[in-house]
């Protein structure tokens, strides 16, 4: 069947079978003589056949460029002379086919089949020849599997190469078509529109990532201009390995910021003008004469030491004077007596004052109603007189004078009414003021709550109960979310055995038992008695008994502030005047005991020590040790007489060098003796009193 198609740049089938094969790039294009295409009668093109021919031509080109290909060299002109794909393959004999087969299998196993050599491997094309050659032999499935695997890899690499080339071509076509569309749009836009030509817009390209480091970094010349030359000079002379180059110690500090400055940045201190002192003048001191006369009175500086004479001092008289002073001081009214009774001005208040211990008790609740503390609530109440309590307000000195006490005492700088507000040194803050009670507060009586009663005989107006109010009648969202199924439903019961909690997972037979504190603590304490402070060891080493107030490990109960408690027993109270009020008991100090121990490692040549000890035991002369010829004689010598270890140690002090003799100790010498006893077959025998060791030769 013949058809007529326009021939404008299309492919034309060769007229004769002997004509040479031309690739699409080198095939000549017909030149049309007229603008109208000419229709010719010719047979239809076989597109599939042309596609195969193009593939084979590319295979041959890659084969010629690959040096590892087993194919023979064929010129492109000779390779394009055939019409069928089989005629384009190189003619190989059986030996070359087997070599080519082994090469393909080797490349497949080493995974070295790439796009460069995939088109030069003809394992797929010679598959039929290989099967014909193997027909006579038994079928080897291992060889067949390897052949199929290598063929699949070769074909896959070829497909990937063709796919990549096609995408390259498509990318180039897209760019060219876009460029042609832009030129066409510009031609259409540049038409005659009022005789004006639109300016061409340029697209600005922005780079989000800068790849040139020179545009980011500053040049070296710009950096050098900002560096202080004085700093460069100081840094060049700085040596980190010497004390002369300590750089920071030479810097100056300015102002309170403690900022270090170089010499060029240091600001000089501002100096103020010196003020001239006023000129001396005379003044009238007649008014000050009376004051000077009072200061010149001959009064003793210390009345208690007025009769003291440095060269005539008597210890007995001094002790009598001190005892008289102590008795006089004890009888004085200014002495603080802890056993004194409470003054009459203090009267127990009707209601206890809330202190820091009752801070957690709610309002309206009496602390005495809580458990067993109700019995002892009297000891925790503060005694004060509310009626006579005078509040300190803003005023002048006359107002403050009213607060002073009429009777002087050690702690009576203020009146007892003012001191009642003071809770002790532990509670240094004053209590807040209490509001003055009015008549309305006293007359206020708590009304009893009316009991709710329901009368079924009365006529009830339901409109009053069911009227609309401003209050919300629906539940809020938070209430609805809290009352969900999860909060009102118990968790699933897994029937877990609680006994497994006390068992170990890896050792189920072992059970964990909980030991109580009483079992583990009370048992050893029962056997321990009270400590005897009068034992000879403590009395000989001076262990003074401290007062109860100096002990921080008191096991007694907490009694609270002393000013707030009542009903204390006299057993827990102490007499502060046992040592005198102004005396302080010195703390117990541990005696410093010097312990001699080796603070540095001692260096000892053990070989030299062994040789010297053996020569001393064998009674060899000292000059014989240094002679190399007599070494064997020294080793072969034996101990003839019994010797004592103490005498051997003293003899080593003379034979060893001074440094080794100083570092030699009895343990080192005895360790060396044990080594010699093992090597020389010596016998060591101790004395009855364990004072020394006898050394003798064992038979």
From Swiss-Prot:
Listed InterPro entries: Condensin_barren_su2
Record's GO cellular component terms: condensin complex; cytosol; nucleus
Chief subcellular location: nucleus
Keyword set, alphabetical order: Cell cycle, Cell division, Chromosome, Cytoplasm, DNA condensation, Mitosis, Nucleus, Phosphoprotein
Subcellular location: Nucleus; Cytoplasm; Chromosome
Molecular functions (GO terms): chromatin binding
The keyword Cytoplasm belongs to this UniProt entry's keyword annotation: yes
The keyword NADP appears for this protein: no
Region (Disordered): 1-35, 176-203
A Gene Ontology BP annotation from the UniProt entry: cell division
UniProt PTM comment: Phosphorylated by CDK1. Its phosphorylation, as well as that of XCAP-D2 and XCAP-G subunits, activates the condensin complex and is required for chromosome condensation.
Family recorded in the similarity comment: Belongs to the CND2 (condensin subunit 2) family.
Subunit architecture: Component of the condensin complex, which contains the XCAP-E/SMC2 and XCAP-C/SMC4 heterodimer, and three non SMC subunits that probably regulate the complex: XCAP-H/NCAPH, XCAP-D2/NCAPD2 and XCAP-G/NCAPG.
Function: Regulatory subunit of the condensin complex, a complex required for conversion of interphase chromatin into mitotic-like condense chromosomes. The condensin complex probably introduces positive supercoils into relaxed DNA in the presence of type I topoisomerases and converts nicked DNA into positive knotted forms in the presence of type II topoisomerase.
Protein name per its UniProtKB record: Condensin complex subunit 2
Species assigned in the record: Xenopus laevis
Gene behind this protein: ncaph
């Amino acid at each position: 069947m013949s058809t007529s198609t326009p021939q404008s740049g299309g492919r034309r089938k060769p007229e004769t079978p002997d004509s040479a094969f031309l690739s699409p790039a080198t095939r000549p294009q017909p030149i049309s003589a007229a603008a109208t295409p000419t229709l010719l009668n010719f047979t239809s093109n076989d597109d599939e056949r042309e596609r195969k021919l193009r593939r084979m031509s590319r295979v041959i080109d890659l084969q010629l460029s690959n040096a590892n290909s087993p194919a023979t060299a064929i010129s492109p002109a000779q390779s394009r002379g055939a019409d069928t794909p089989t005629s384009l393959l190189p003619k190989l004999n059986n030996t070359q086919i087997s070599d080519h087969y082994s090469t393909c299998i080797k490349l497949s196993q080493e995974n070295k089949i790439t796009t460069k050599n995939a088109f030069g491997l003809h394992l797929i094309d010679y598959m039929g020849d290989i099967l014909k050659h193997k027909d006579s032999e038994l079928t080897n499935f291992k060889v067949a599997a390897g052949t199929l695997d290598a063929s699949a890899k070769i074909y896959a690499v070829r497909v990937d190469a063709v796919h990549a080339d096609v995408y390259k071509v498509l990318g180039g076509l897209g760019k060219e078509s876009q460029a042609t569309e832009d030129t066409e749009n510009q031609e259409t836009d540049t038409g005659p529109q009022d005789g004006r030509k639109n300016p061409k817009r340029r697209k600005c390209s922005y780079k989000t990532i800068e790849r040139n480091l020179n545009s980011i970094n500053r040049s070296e010349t710009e950096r050098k201009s900002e560096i202080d030359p004085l700093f460069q000079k100081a840094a060049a002379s700085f040596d980190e390995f010497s004390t002369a180059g300590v750089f920071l110690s030479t810097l100056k500090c300015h102002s309170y910021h403690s900022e270090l400055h170089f010499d060029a940045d240091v600001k000089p201190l501002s100096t103020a003008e010196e003020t001239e002192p006023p000129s001396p003048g005379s003044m009238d001191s007649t008014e000050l004469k009376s004051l000077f006369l009072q200061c010149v009175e001959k009064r003793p500086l210390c009345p208690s030491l007025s009769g003291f004479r440095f060269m005539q001092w008597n210890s007995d008289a001094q002790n009598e004077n001190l005892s008289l002073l102590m008795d006089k001081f004890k009888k004085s009214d200014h002495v603080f007596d802890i056993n004194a009774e409470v003054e009459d001005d203090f009267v127990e208040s009707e209601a206890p004052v809330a202190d820091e211990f009752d801070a957690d008790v709610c309002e309206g609740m009496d602390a005495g109603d809580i458990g067993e503390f109700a019995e002892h609530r009297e000891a925790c109440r503060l005694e004060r007189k509310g009626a006579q309590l005078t509040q300190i307000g803003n005023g002048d000195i006359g107002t403050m004078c009213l607060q002073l006490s009429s009777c002087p005492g050690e702690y009576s700088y203020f009146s007892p009414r003012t001191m009642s507000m003071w809770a002790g040194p532990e509670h240094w803050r004053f209590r807040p003021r209490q509001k003055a009670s009015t008549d309305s507060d006293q007359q206020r009586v708590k009304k009893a709550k009316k009991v709710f009663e329901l009368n079924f005989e009365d006529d009830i107006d339901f409109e009053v109960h069911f009227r609309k109010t401003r209050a919300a009648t629906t539940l809020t969202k938070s209430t609805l979310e809290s009352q969900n199924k999860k909060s009102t439903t118990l968790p699933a019961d897994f029937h877990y055995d609680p006994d497994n909690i006390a068992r170990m997972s890896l050792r189920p037979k072992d059970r964990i038992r909980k030991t109580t504190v009483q079992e583990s603590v009370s048992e050893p304490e029962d056997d321990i008695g009270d400590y005897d402070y009068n034992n000879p060891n403590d009395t000989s080493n001076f262990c003074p008994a401290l007062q109860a107030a100096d002990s921080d490990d008191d096991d007694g109960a907490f009694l609270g502030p002393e000013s707030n408690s009542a009903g204390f027993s006299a057993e827990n109270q102490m007499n502060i005047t046992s040592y005198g009020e102004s005396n302080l008991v010195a703390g117990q100090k541990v005696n410093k005991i010097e312990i001699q121990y080796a603070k540095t490692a001692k260096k000892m040549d053990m070989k030299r020590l062994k040789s010297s000890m053996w020569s001393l035991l064998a009674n060899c002369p000292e000059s014989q040790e240094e002679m190399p010829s007599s070494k064997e004689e020294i080793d072969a010598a034996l101990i003839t007489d019994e010797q004592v270890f103490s005498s051997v140690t003293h003899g080593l002090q003379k034979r060893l060098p001074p440094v080794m003799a100083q570092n030699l100790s009895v343990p080192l010498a005895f360790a060396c003796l044990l080594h010699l006893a093992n090597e020389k077959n010596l016998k060591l025998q101790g004395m009855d009193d364990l004072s020394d060791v006898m050394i003798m030769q064992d038979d």
